[in-house]
Amino acid sequence: MEIAGYRGGSLRGSLQGSLRRSVSAWRSPSTSDVFGRSSREEDDEEALKWAALEKLPTYDRLRKGIMTGDGGEIQEVDIQGLGFQERKNLLEKLVRNAEEDNERFLLKLRNRMERVGIDNPTIEVRFEHLNINAEAFVGNRGVPTLVNFFVNKAIWILSALHLMPSGKRPISILHDVSGIIKPCRMTLLLGPPGAGKTTLLLALAGKLDNTLKVTGNVTYNGHGMHEFVPQRTSAYISQHDVHIGEMTVRETLAFSSRCQGVGTRYEMLTELSRREKEANIKPDPDVDVYMKAVAVEGQESVVTDYILKILGLDICADTMVGDGMIRGISGGQKKRVTTGEMLVGPSKALFMDEISTGLDSSTTFQIVNSLRQSVHILGGTALIALLQPAPETYDLFDDILLLSDGQIVYQGPRENVLEFFESMGFKCPERKGVADFLQEVTSRKDQQQYWVRENEPYRFVPVNEFSEAFKSFHVGAKLHEELSTPFDRSRNHPAALTTSKYGISKMELLKACIDREWLLMKRNSFVYIFKVVQLIVLALIAMTVFFRTKLPRNGLEDATIFFGAMFLGLVTHLFNGFAELAMSIAKLPVFYKQRDLLFYPPWAYALPTWILKIPISFVECGVWIAMTYYVIGFDPNVVRMFRHYLLLVLISQVASGLFRLLAAVGRDMVVADTFGAFAQLVLLVLGGFIIAREKIKKFWIWGYWSSPLMYAQNAIAVNEFLGHSWNKLVDATGQTLGERFLRNRGIFVDKNWYWIGVGALIGYMVLFNFLFILFLEWLDPLGKGQTTVSEEALQEKEANRTGANVELATRGSAATSDGGSVEIRKDGNRKKGMVLPFTPLSITFDNVKYSVDMPQEMKDRGVTEDKLLLLKGVSGAFRPGVLTALMGVSGRGKTTLMDVLAGRKTGGYIEGDIRISGYPKNQETFARISGYCEQNDIHSPHVTVYESLLYSAWLRLPAEVDEKQRKMFVDEVMDLVELNSLRGSLVGLPGVTGLSTEQRKRLTIAVELVANPSIIFMDEPTSGLDARAAAIVMRAVRNTVDTGRTVVCTIHQPSIDIFEAFDELFLMKRGGEEIYVGPLGRQSSHLIKYFESIDGVKKIKERYNPATWMLEVTTISQEEILGLNFAEVYRNSDLYKRNKDLIKELSTPPPGSKDLFFATQFSQSFVMQCLACLWKQHKSYWRNPSYTATRLFFTVVIALIFGTIFWDLGKKRSTSLDLINAMGSMYAAVLFIGIQNAQTVQPIVDVERTVFYREKAAGMYSALPYAYAQVLIEVPHILVQTLLYGLLVYSMIGFDWTAAKFLWYMFFMFFTFLYFTYYGMMAVAMTPNSDIAAIVAAAFYAIWNIFAGFIIPRPRIPIWWRWYYWACPVAWTLYGLVVSQFGEYTDTMSDVDETVKDFLRRFLGFRHDFLPVVGVMVVVFTVLFASIFAFSIKTLNFQRR
């Protein structure tokens, strides 16, 4: 028997700690003990308490422990009732310092179990002959264009029906891989991007996507995946950080720990306690309390606290995780939360995917070291993929698994890996990390530089050959032998593999989910308060528009107005549920992650989201009823009021349920929005208000009977119109006015319909929520868009694997065709001259200071100064052909200095002297000769790489450069940064579609290079890249410098070879002061010599990274130890004097030179700027079918729905009801398609706006051409939309086919769709992001709905609101549409005894002779919204720098 569970909190909690053995005693007695009671008395007391504890039955014994209190007294504690302070004290005693005490603590845990002969359960994971293939489109078929979208959809339908092949080709991800991941050993997974690392980790953790074709098998301790629950036996830690932003770090980990439960720890502890009692062994009381706390359910906090400490997250434990909208923890901390989320559970095998991205090397070392201690001491199994492990982190691993192009190149002990490659003729250079070498040695482009056999010519060694050679290498042969001997299943520990699906009981899971949902509702209270405020505003408008003194009860028209008021109440609560859609979709990624990790079943997640929202519906509807019911003058009977209230609550709940369901089905905002609009459309149009029941066609009547709104409307109408207020008799048959109205509108005149409606709504509420649970269970998150591969990439992958000599489409890139060397060289022939000449320029800055207004929170803490100084007078010079690294730990002012020099700051105060080749810097001209590569690679997602570069060149190169030269120059730049093979690839959205991070970095550099700048600034060009990708980017940077340009890069944690590719270093310390400015020297010799000459600075170790050493020896704590200020040391050095002389020399213009001068601010004329922007917008729209194609599809479907529902209504005008129905068709179409247009355009404009900020700052164009292009590109798309909609609907509804009527109809529809779209764009331009824009815009849709003239006609609107009718664009559209179709008819109507023309004028206030004015007004609104959009884009900047 052994202690299976201890991997969780305690042991596997232990999973994080660090291996600096400390000699200090574990708990030295404090001095006060000497004067206190004698230790013998304490021992006696402890022995007595322990003896009492031993006598308790097992259940109680495991829930009691002995701890030493703050005052040294011995006390018995209840494990389940440990408070925060007690937990803190316990951890302080056990693991005071994570780096020093963790290993000793883990050893104590192990020793306690070994003393009584209990072993830890271990897991050996084997995979044999594993093949994994995917299917993808190759070449242009996969590029999303408007045409491809419809073609691919059609082919998909035909292939699903087996009528034709899908046209996808199989692509191999992993090819025949076999190996063993052993327990008690740390295995590092390495490989270049696209090698298949993530796929291998997912396969081993049993989490592969079911669309992949998999053969081969994976076993744990000889057991197949179907014999246990792999998701709970092992933990897969993803490279994506998906968390709920509104929860704190501690809450996130505690929830995870609570769901995962304690595994088998409790059973192990029972056995341990029994054996200790038999052997009469007394354990260490603190270790005993800890082990009991992590084994008893409900005490997850101890595990959480331990993991927080080990991961260094205790400093931000109570900070929100944060997301795009909420400011939270840093990216590096988020990465650690993702790791911690799985470490708090009891899993015994860990598969970790790139857990170090965004962490500095010391933190990565600390975390990996803690994992290593846990794996070694407690017998864990770990396979960890890291991007750029530093040499010291690399040395912590026992085994290396190297993958390349889906094959295993090496798997075995770390010590033998270099020996294997040397046997193949490749050697790792002195000053290169082994991990970096391993990432590059299998790559066609990077291999040659490592070839060492001088007597043999180099030839490319493909992956296949390495893989075959490894099988005959002694490590490979031994692995093969081990694999051929099956695992002895009798050695499998009973507690090693988990067989239960969930960690805790169903009731506990539900409680955990309820607690979390309640917490999130409290954190999101702003949303609920905002919704209530919005309701109050709408209620104020409703009660003053439908004011009781203005509402008599004399005839059917009066009843119609009351009916409108009821309809408004229902619709308001129906649409109020729309917020549920966005909120549900936002939470789905976290749900899918936790569902797949088996934290909880879908029902446990769905029930709390439903049940906890019920009280909110009561509050919202209560506010509405309280404000409107009696003011509008509905039936005063209290019972009827409460019935009205109940119906509103139910419709509100039905709406929430429906939108949650649509979120689960759509899973994406655009798709769900479209579904949402369809749902609202069918509910509304067929609900019985817009078109009466008798008028609904037979083939649509099912829609009427299945619309929840119909039941609500029937019930609410019956409740009101069968009341006392409406019992005035209207004819001899004894019919009351209320009954007559109900019959007239096709509503059932039976009082039981109230309860039928209530029953139906309850049924719908339950049904929608039940379906929500089912879809959460069935559906997986949407894929990463179309899987596409270019023909070239496929050939290159194949060539890499087999060594086939493919002539790749990489024109001019010698490196590809003949495997030329690609190390980052400083020397070599300088590439002089490209197609376009440029002037080399230097930039000098002397005593530059930058300050901002003192933040309010610092003033609150007693800081008296008004300004906060971020740069304290820095000086330096950057010269042509010299590559300068700008370095310093985070927060030292690197990016600030660069923004100041480049003129990118939008606020703050700048002082000091900045000169360009001796002349004072002028920002207008400087933008023309400089480039700035931002850290976040911001590009238009829907254009190709080549188009991005062509566009940048078009707008930034001088007007005299003709098109041919421009294209030649773009080709040269693509060559320089190795983008030729990606020429036709779509850029895509970062991390979602399109280019990889490293490819985006190179595109960012190329976009600046095609402007032919003399000075380039780059902000962290290598962050987030693996060693090989970083080398490719640095090679592009080096090539750029060698053309004679001035290049400055900020850089974070570089490897040795990247660091030494720089010529000079500009090192800053906290507070924005320089501490070293000068040349690096060969192998960093100048830098090392400078710092080692300072008294007390520790010498650099052999083969240590000088960049890491330099940051370590210049920290603030080192300054305190040495008692000096490095900034002072620098100011007193010869280096400082040399730099001052250099600045002086470069600050005087060379004789005969002229200051920079450009005749115009921009390189292209206003018209050319407009054309270029329009060209890019056209490309973007054409390749964005999820927007353009969805909109056309949506329009056609709505046109067909409307055309069939309102079939032939245009010819009917014998009664006023016919006219109202026809008007309803127009009102519903305008509102629906209009709002849909406004909603879907918002995310598009929002994404493009961030690109606009970058391009405008780069001096590509002024704001107006961009705004005009954005406005104009919509016109042809909306025109097509109008033609599709207009032709279908006009012919199906059967309006008169006269040219004037048809053209007026098309005119109004076109401009209405257009102004709605521009309104959506305007809302984004005036707000910081599309989320806020959607909320602001939605408020107006509701108000426009009231004043459109359909729910209440203009003559019936109280005089104090009538002005708003004229300010409502929808009212003008409805006026124009109704009058242009019906305004001239003089037929008499049967039910009101007046002509159509007179009825329109009396009841609706519409006059035919006013039509031209109406037409002009619709155009005015279109121009107004477009102009406000353009003005806002020009004047408002929501970017903060």
Curated annotation (Swiss-Prot):
Induction info: Induced by abiotic stresses such as cold-stress, cycloheximide and sodium chloride (NaCl). Induction by abscisic acid (ABA) is repressed by cytokinin such as kinetin (at protein level).
Tagged with keyword Cell membrane: yes
UniProt GO BP: defense response
Expression sites (tissue/organ): Ubiquitous.
Topology relative to the membrane: Multi-pass membrane protein
Chain residues that bind ATP 1: G191, P192, P193, G194, A195, G196, K197, T198
GO MF entries: ABC-type transporter activity; ATP binding; ATP hydrolysis activity
SMART domains: AAA
UniProt similarity note: Belongs to the ABC transporter superfamily. ABCG family. PDR (TC 3.A.1.205) subfamily.
Protein name per Swiss-Prot or TrEMBL: Pleiotropic drug resistance protein TUR2
Organism: Spirodela polyrhiza (Giant duckweed)
